Regions:
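N-terminal helical cap/lid subdomain that shapes the substrate entry/recognition surface
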Residues: 2-90, 94, 98
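Substrate-recognition element of Asp-dependent hydrolases with the DxDx(T/V) motif
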Residues: 88-117
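Conserved H-loop
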Residues: 35, 122-127, 155, 201
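Surface-exposed amphipathic alpha-helices with a cationic face
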Residues: 89-97, 149, 169-173
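A short, structured active-site edge motif that brings together acidic residues
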Residues: 40-41, 123-138
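Conserved Lys-Pro-Asp/Glu-containing loop-to-beta segment of HAD-superfamily phosphomonoesterases
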Residues: 5, 140-169
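Acidic, Mg2+-coordinating phosphoryl-transfer loop and its flanking beta/alpha structural elements
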Residues: 161-199
């Protein structure tokens, strides 16, 4: 397989942002008087925010709703209502020590990815922090992956994508990259097994069994 680089999704892969994201979606929905069921909002952890609010609020208000969400997520501290998953730090440290190029490829804006990695003291393991743009011009997973490839000069055939949702695995497939799905995040076994993957894992430490 000869992987030289690993691209990680953030939400549901490295950290569990459920509380902060759901609180921020709820904040925006309440502003527009849209009734929601909290459990049903979990499906929106992963895809681009504008797509979430097109479905929840309506296409005409989606971009405005993203700004309301960010009021709660950024200024309101929602990004730190978040937990790092077990074994993430030691696995990142081990993979870095083995010489892999480590990058994030998240649909969350890069500025927030950066702050969250710093908050959990894991930014030091990454060679490049890739995320979406605040203006929405880069938001879909394949566009983020393409940006990271361009910025780092890495060949797609040398990259393994790791993520918890179909958006991660499908984004990798569209960019002709291999992918591993993690089952401890927000995507079900059914969702991930329906996508092209080289493995589905229950713990991030299992990556070390896949990678030489």
């Amino acid at each position: 397989m000869g992987y030289k680089a690993i691209f990680f999704d953030l939400d549901g892969t490295l950290t569990n942002p459920e509380e902060g994201i759901l609180n921020s979606i709820q904040y925006a929905a309440d502003y527009y008087n849209v009734a929601t069921v909290r459990e049903d909002l979990k499906k929106y952890i992963g895809p681009p925010l504008v797509d979430t609010f097109k479905e929840l609020i309506g296409e005409d208000k989606a971009e405005e709703a993203v700004e309301k969400y960010r009021e709660r997520f950024a200024a309101g501290g929602g990004m730190y209502e978040n937990e790092i998953y077990p074994n993430v730090r030691q696995t990142l440290a081990s993979l870095k020590e083995k010489g892999y190029i480590m990058c994030t490829a998240s649909s969350k804006p890069q500025i927030f990815v950066d702050k969250i990695l710093e908050h959990f003291d894991i930014k030091k393991y990454f060679d490049f922090v890739g995320g979406a743009s605040l203006d929405g011009s880069v938001s879909k997973k394949e566009d983020v992956i393409k940006l990271v490839l361009q910025q780092t000069g890495i060949e797609n055939s040398q990259v393994l994508m790791v993520g918890d949702r179909k958006f991660d695995l499908e984004g990798a497939r569209r960019m002709n990259m291999d992918a591993v799905g993690v089952l401890y995040g927000f995507g079900s076994y059914e969702e991930l097994s329906a996508c092209k993957n080289i493995a589905l894992i229950k713990d991030i430490t299992e990556l070390e069994k896949i990678l030489p």
